[in-house]
Amino acid sequence: MADITETLQERGKRYGVFTRHAEISQQLKEVINQYQTKVLAADQQEALDMICHKIGRIINGDPDYADSWHDIAGYAQLVADRLNGTDR
């Protein structure tokens, strides 16, 4: 059990309090759902969900953690690749 406690403490230091992160992420997703006018493919929706998750971590935690920004670019790239004919 100490391992999960350590992991949660490390994540908390990097990303902030989880309940606040959850509120931020869910509010971002609500905005997308409220204004979405077209049905998205599953990968597009999932990428947006994950991007909201990563933005929540950036806003709530360490905005200088490059990996969060890298992940956002990666999710967007996966969709762009599929749209351009390369399914990963």
Segments the model singles out, each with a brief description of its role:
Residues 1-88:
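Intrinsically disordered, low-complexity regulatory regions
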